[in-house]
Each structure stands twice: as C-alpha cells, then as structure tokens.
Amino acid sequence: MFISEIQLKNYRNYEKLELSFEDKVNVIIGENAQGKTNLMEAIYVLAMAKSHRTSNDRELIRWDEDFGQIKGKLQKRNSSLSLELNISKKGKKAKLNQLEQQKLSQYIGVMNVVMFAPEDLNLVKGSPQVRRRFLDMELGQIAPVYLYELSQYQKVLTQRNHLLKKMQGNSKNEETMLDVFTLQLIEHGAKILQKRFEFLHLLQEWAAPIHRGISRGLEELEIVYKPSVDVSESMDLSKIKEVYYESFQSVKQREIFRGTTLIGPHRDDLQFFVNSKNVQVFGSQGQQRTTALSLKLAEIELIYSEVKEYPILLLDDVLSELDDYRQSHLLNTIQGKVQTFVTTTSVDGIEHETLKEAKTIHVTNGTVDCEIDRE
C-alpha cells in the first residue's frame, strides 16, 4: 500500500498544504522546527488517529484555530481509498470514502504504518510505558478488536482508580462497586493479555532471524513478556481470568491503601534477551539499537503476513542515529517494496541507492518551497 497524496488544514504549523508522493521513497528535508516532523506525524495520525508525540489532540491544531484536518488518498492492491480525520476540541471524527465511521476502531488498520524515530531507540532501555505503547499501537493495526478491548479496559481502570482513591477514607460502603469494576477489568484484561501473547509469539518469529542477520549470526534475540500476575502463554482465557481474580483478591487491601490498581496489563512489561543476557541491563548501546531495529523490521514483515500488503514506513530523523552498517541494512531491507518517508536536515553523508531514486521535498516554516526528483 502507499499514500499518493495528503492535504492538511490548520495542522500544527501548516495552515494549508496539498502534496503528492512517490510510491517508493520520499525524502523530506528541512532545518529543525520547520515542519518536516509535523508532516511525518500527520501521515501517522491519518493512519492511527492519534499522535506518537503527544496524547493531547489540541496540540495538533494550529494555534488560534478551532479545528485541524488531514485528508489522504491511499492506494491498496485492489482498491483506492480516501481517508479523512477531523480534529476539534470535542474530539476526532474519521471518514472512509466520505462515510463517517462510528468508532475509530473501525477506521484504524485500514492504512498501516510503522514509525521509526529517535525515541524508538529507547524502546529497549526506556520505561515500561514505552514498550506497552509499542505493543498497543502495533497490535491495534492488525487486530481492531484489541483496540476495543483496550479502550474498554482503560475506561474501567479510570473508574476503578477513582473509586479506590475514594475508598482510602472509608472502604466499607463501596466494596460491592469495587467488585463490579474488578470483574469488568478482568474480562477485558484477560483478552488483552491473550492478544499480546499471540502477537509477541509472531513478532519473535520475525525478529529473531532479522536480529541474527544484522549481527552476522553472532546474536540470538528473545522477547519475553513480563505480566504483573502469574500467567503464561499456554493458559486459556478462562484460566487467565481465574488467575486474575485470585490475584485481585490478594492485593485488594493494598490497592485500597494505595488508592490505585496494582495489577493488570497496564502494569506489564517486555524484556529483551540477547544470547540469554538481558539487553536492557547488560547490553551495549549497539546491541540495544540492533534490537530496536530488529523489532521495527519485524513489524513490517508481521504486518505484511497479516494483511498481505506492506505498511508505509516513516523514518523520522532516525538514519543519522544509526551507524553506516545498520543504516545500510535498514535501507537494503526496505528497498523497492515499502513506501518510505525519510526526514533529515541533509542527505549529505547518506549514500544509498534507495535515496538516489527518491522524491525530495524541501520544507521551510510550514511551507513546501520546492519538490524535485533526485537524479
């Protein structure tokens, strides 16, 4: 699949923009704070209906405006689709072929993207929240039902945490309501956990050989899911629910004392092992970056295996963060088969056949000054 054009209105520092793209490689060049990352973000938001940079949708709307809009044309193997996302203070509305979607979960997954930005290099050594977000965003693209379960879980979690804070003063009168929220949380949480296990099993199958290739056969990568309760991938849904129920009973008084939910998918984490050593703790910076790159390349292949089309790859100022070897491995892997967007302050020092065939877009202060095809 590839995006052939995009239109922005009141998005970040763009008042109005219409731009067409090549189906292979597009290089967006500009100095810092000119709008190249905003353009890249707009493509991501068009696909995912949320930003990878902020959870506050208001930040996506141009200063002093009431709404922002992103439109795009997506070319898939057997169809052409128009996508539209309208952002206002009241929320977001999405359209497919001019038809408004009742739920964003019906919209997300139509256009698949993989974002690789400098912050993704922190996927390995960053906080558990970064790794959970990675899971949620990638799983949501190939399993819309996961997004539904996740949104329901988060709603119940918010209500339950509010009740737990209230119960810190007097818990006697609210225990029945707490039990109701607990059962709802278990129902959605168990399904989320099961989907995560399935996804990571597939991701492992792709990431391990990719990592082996990048490391020239010297390293073996293993991805391990670390749940907050004693469950395993081999358990069925009913057994997972049973373990959750028992675990919630055992931490009930602690949760009331702390005023927050102490177990569940929102507390889980991932660990990465290279040659049986925890790369988060003992890995070199090179091993951590190879692991992050392996995960991103595995995402591309996993999405292809599920939807039978390659996703759109967004490389936001990340090439300069990779050494020549990893840079070349990345570009060699995607060459000719994945529509790719690259942002950079300059193409100097990046010598690769892929970029020589690219369409180049120069961005200055929220406007596209010129577009040329590199010779």
UniProtKB/Swiss-Prot annotation:
General function of this protein: The RecF protein is involved in DNA metabolism; it is required for DNA replication and normal SOS inducibility. RecF binds preferentially to single-stranded, linear DNA. It also seems to bind ATP.
Principal localization? cytoplasm
* Gene behind the chain: recF
Q: Name one GO biological process term.
A: SOS response
Q: What is this protein identified as?
A: DNA replication and repair protein RecF
- Quote the record's binding site residues for ATP: 30-37
Tell me which UniProt keywords the record has, alphabetically.
ATP-binding, Cytoplasm, DNA damage, DNA repair, DNA replication, DNA-binding, Nucleotide-binding, SOS response
What is the top-level taxon of the source organism?
Answer: Bacteria
| Gene3D superfamilies reported for this sequence | P-loop containing nucleotide triphosphate hydrolases, RecF/RecN/SMC, N-terminal domain
For this protein, the record's InterPro entries field holds:
DNA-binding_RecF (IPR001238), DNA-binding_RecF_CS (IPR018078), P-loop_NTPase (IPR027417), RecF/RecN/SMC_N (IPR003395), RecF_2 (IPR042174)
GO MF annotations, alphabetized: ATP binding; single-stranded DNA binding
Instruction: Tell me where in or outside the cell this protein is found.
Output: Cytoplasm
- Decide whether keyword Cytoplasm is in the record: yes
